[in-house]
Regions:
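Asparagine/serine/threonine-enriched low-complexity, disordered tracts
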Residues: 105, 112-114, 122, 132-134, ...
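NAD(P)+-binding Rossmann beta1-loop-alpha1 motif at the extreme N-terminus of oxidoreductases
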Residues: 2, 31-85, 93-94
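Rossmann-like NAD(P)(H) cofactor-binding subdomain of soluble oxidoreductases
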Residues: 97-98, 148-233, 249
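Intrinsically disordered, low-complexity repeat/linker tracts enriched for polar/charged residues
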Residues: 6-17, 21-28, 32, 115, ...
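Internal alpha-helical scaffold of NAD(P)-dependent oxidoreductase catalytic cores
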Residues: 174, 203-216, 233-281, 285-320
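Short, low-complexity intrinsically disordered segments enriched in A/P/G/S/L with frequent Arg
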Residues: 18-19, 29-30, 108, 118-119, ...
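Short acidic low-complexity segments
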Residues: 88-103, 138-152
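NAD(P)-dependent Rossmann-like dehydrogenase/reductase catalytic/cofactor-binding core
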Residues: 276, 283-287, 312-322, 326, ...
Length: 418
């Protein structure tokens, strides 16, 4: 890391720079320009890449989908983000080795047809940064150490949840590289892996080993991509078991329009950001069936109770779910018109099939996968999650939303704490 020991992250004061025009939403630069690799150039990844580039950092954004990268290069825009312009200084590539090694130049040549054909992804898969090892998938790329000639200072993970394990495996630190020399990874992807039932930071740790835990952070909170793209006020939290890392991530991302708080309950932050997507699908069903504000308020409240029950059973702190990554993200995703998961639930309530609703949205609906993982975790740990159970039944067992509502409302009487 520029000007610092590889083991340390610089402390800073978040001083607003008062003499900048209102359109320039940045802080007094407390960090020297950092070399940042963003893995995943879907809507969230490219907005975060542009955010960091506009703060003065050197940013490379990678995606497995050649057509996505070439479109971004040619238009500096994204079809799902009207009016958004990619920061001019963001370097875009489909070459993973280029993305993680700043000693290599990023090719500016147009991506050839043979490369685009090798990456046989439809638009929905491209947004997901699908990484299943099919033809055209990148080779492994060892990330140079922090402080080396080409080493990035930070890696931001913005791929869909089902691609995170592959990224961790492809970018595994060299066997002889101490954890303290490994660039920190900031996980901005939300989800729970279906096979391992691990959240995303846990997935990376399971690939690299426990000694790397302090090199992993999570950025999460109520943050619609389209509003971050428009530089509307947004507040999130940076969580890590390493307080110096959470402070570093705070400083890296924070502006006077993108406020970041630090946290140390990584598990709670990740579970909050993942489980709320399942509850948001239920809220969308509620609104699609026109059940009223009373029903939505009850669903959000009881959904939060389910999140807390599962989180505490897994070792998270209950108070984390009252914060930005829990209640904050839950309210936004259940009530906001920009929520994919809420929209997905609304479409189901109005008669669309699961596949029709997914196709109409055209982007990843993380709650679809998380419903399966959350239910499996609840069964494994003996946690009662009736809303999650009914969402799972609608999505994966063909149950109608009307029948799910009837079963939820027909449950036996019990104390609220249950």
């Amino acid at each position: 890391m520029t000007g610092t020991s590889p083991a340390e992250f610089p402390r800073s004061e978040h001083r607003l720079q008062p003499d900048l025009p209102r359109s320039e939403h940045r802080l007094q630069p407390d960090l020297p320009p950092q070399k940042v690799t963003v893995l995943g150039a879907g809507v969230w990844g490219i907005v975060l890449a542009s955010h960091l580039a506009r703060k003065g950092h050197v940013v490379r954004a990678w995606d497995v989908a050649a057509q996505v990268v070439e479109r971004l290069r040619q238009t500096l825009s994204h079809p799902k983000l009207p009016g958004f312009r990619v920061a001019d200084t963001v370097q875009l590539t489909t070459n993973l080795a280029e993305a993680v090694d700043f000693s290599k130049n990023c090719s500016s040549e147009p991506i050839g047809e043979h490369q685009a054909e090798a990456c046989t992804l439809n638009e929905n898969q491209a947004e997901a940064c699908t990484l299943n090892g099919e033809e055209g998938a990148p080779r492994a790329a060892l990330i140079p150490a922090v402080g080396s000639k080409g080493g990035p200072d930070c890696v931001v993970v913005a791929a869909a949840s089902h691609g995170v394990r592959a990224l961790a495996e492809w970018c595994r630190p060299p066997a002889d590289q101490p954890p303290r020399q490994t660039p920190p990874w900031v996980v901005c992807s939300k989800g729970i892996e279906e096979d391992s039932l691990l959240p995303m930071a846990g997935v990376i740790e399971s690939v690299w080993g426990a000694p790397y835990r302090d090199r992993i952070a999570v950025l999460s909170g109520p943050s619609f991509t389209a509003e971050v793209a428009r530089q509307l006020p947004t507040t999130v939290c940076a969580a890590s078991t390493n307080p110096r890392l959470s402070e570093y991530v705070q400083t890296l991302f924070m502006t006077n329009r993108f406020r970041v708080y630090t946290q140390d309950d990584v598990l709670g932050v990740e579970l909050g950001g993942s489980l709320k997507n399942v509850i948001a699908i239920a809220a969308g069903v509620c609104d699609g069936m026109e059940l009223g504000d009373n029903a939505r308020a009850a669903l959000i409240t009881r959904g939060l109770a389910e999140m807390i029950r599962l989180g505490t059973a897994l070792g998270a702190r209950p108070e984390t779910f009252a914060g930005l990554a829990g209640m904050g993200d839950l309210i936004l995703t259940c009530c906001g018109s920009l929520s994919r998961n809420h929209t997905f639930g609304t479409l189901l309530a109005r008669g669309r099939t699961v596949q029709e609703a997914l196709a109409e949205i055209g982007m990843v609906v993380e709650g679809m996968r998380t419903a399966r993982s959350a239910r499996a975790l609840a069964l494994k740990h003996g946690v009662t999650m009736p809303i999650v159970e009914e969402v799972y039944a609608v999505l994966h067992e063909g149950k109608s939303p009307q029948a799910a509502l009837q079963d939820l409302m027909g449950r036996g009487a019990r104390p609220e704490r249950d």
